[in-house]
A protein has these predicted regions:
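Bacterial Sec-dependent N-terminal signal peptides
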Residues: 2-5, 17-40
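Intrinsically disordered and other compositionally biased segments
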Residues: 6-7, 48
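Bacterial N-terminal signal peptides
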Residues: 9-17
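Intrinsic disorder/low-complexity segments
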Residues: 17-20, 42, 147, 157
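A short, structural micro-pattern
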Residues: 31-33, 76, 148
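Surface-exposed helix/loop patches within compact recognition domains
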Residues: 37-40, 44-129, 141
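C-terminal or internal capping secondary-structure element at the end of a domain, subdomain, or sheet
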Residues: 124-160
């Protein structure tokens, strides 16, 4: 009789441990890291929610493409493409940096020869879904006008 409360306690403890046990519904699905490209463009703030990084061969030159865009379902239009010569961290300026910006009206802008144009890549893991981190500032122009991109930040996902 005296052991009955002890027995109930042990039974309750076993049930609690079993209920709190880890579920074995298979391995958890890894969550893809979030990405963002944000920049001040003249007097506006642009933020691209879909951002990816690719390494590509252009003719015989090894390049890195950093791409920012809106979702196909978004009412916002436009994109930003930054191409760098090489695939490493560091400061990219001059002929090692190419920029194409398309605004919401479809106007296409290209990097100017401004000597202050730069892209700084601080982190570049070359693994699938690795997070590439950097910053940038540059000017682009077209027949529609000129735009200064400043205080830009890159958090983009490496694809290949």
């Amino acid at each position: 009789m005296k052991n009955r409360p002890l027995l109930r306690s042990l039974l309750f403890l076993c049930c609690a441990v079993y209920a709190c046990g880890k579920s074995s519904n298979g391995p958890s699905t890894p969550v893809a890291p979030t990405s963002s490209i944000s920049v001040s463009a003249n007097d506006s703030l642009l933020t691209y929610p879909i951002n990816m990084v690719f390494t590509q061969e252009v003719n015989t030159t090894h390049t890195t493409l950093i791409s920012g865009q809106y979702a196909d379902t978004s009412s916002k239009k436009g994109s930003l493409s930054i191409r760098l010569v090489g695939d490493t961290t560091g400061l990219f300026k001059g002929n090692s940096l190419f920029v194409t910006y398309t605004d919401g009206k479809g106007n296409v802008y290209y990097k100017t020869g401004d000597s202050t144009n730069f892209v700084q890549v601080d982190k570049f893991p070359k693994t699938y879904n690795g997070v590439v981190i950097g910053s940038f500032s540059f000017a682009v122009s077209s027949s529609a006008g000129a735009i200064r991109f400043s205080n830009g930040s890159i958090i983009a996902i490496y694809q290949k």
